[in-house]
Amino acid sequence: MSKIAIIIPAMNEERSIAKVIDGLRAHFDFPIIVVDDASTDDTRQIAEKRGAIVLPHILNLGAWRATQTGLRYAINKGFDSVITCDADGQHPAQAVESLLGQANDSDALVIGSCLARGSTGRHIAWRVFKRLSGLNVSDLTSGLRLYRRPAMAVLASRQATMFEYQDVGVLLMLQKLNMSCSEVSVNMQERKDGISRIFHSWGAVISYLLYTGILSISRLGPFKAEEYHQKLISGANSE
């Protein structure tokens, strides 16, 4: 039987993290790994009281590197798959159930997509990034994802640490390595507490658009997928 863990990167989510953990525990027996990205509130303490495995960052490293911390922990503990979801309550247990119920066992990555969310501007940006990058993914920024062991090994590597977000760069890397990806439709909820790490200010939005645009145009540059894949797997196994 496949060993699955849930990874939740979190920063200053004390208002929502208890409800998120309780909701998941009511539906699943999977270990819940909360990576506390140097929160200044009680996120860590609340997650610990709710029985989650808490991996604390001393410094704020961002949501993607927090996710990497969870991936490395899961690999070291022998998990075959992980589900990543947000700490703000956007991904209810029902969405995780939909993701698991519709996931294809042969895919290295399964994305829980919700095209109903997001503003018109965000949808326009998605279409532009899809065109520039060549990615055939509808919901580029969804944090609700199922990663199988091959994708986990690649994305836990030092080479993948260059990314700032769990979207275009991650998808491009897996695509370059010929890893299969699929999407399933899920229902998500609106964020009720906290602030978005990307959309909390115009400066952050512009920085994200520039960063993602450059990644999309570059497509991570030319390299031999199989050779790079073996290098990443070897590096991940040695860490």
What are these regions (language model features)?
Residues 193:
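Glycine/proline-rich active-site loop of Rossmann-fold NAD(P)-dependent oxidoreductases
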Residues 134-135:
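Conserved C-terminal "switch" segment of AAA+ ATPases
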Residues 124-125, 143:
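Activation loop
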Residues 1-123, 131, 147-157, 165-188, ...:
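Structured catalytic core of nucleotide-sugar glycosyltransferases
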Residues 200-202:
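C-terminal, flexible cofactor-proximal segment of oxidoreductases
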Residues 138-147:
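Short glycine- and hydrophobic/aromatic-rich loop-to-beta-strand nucleating segment
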Residues 128:
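Membrane-proximal helix-turn-helix segments that form the acceptor-binding/catalytic region
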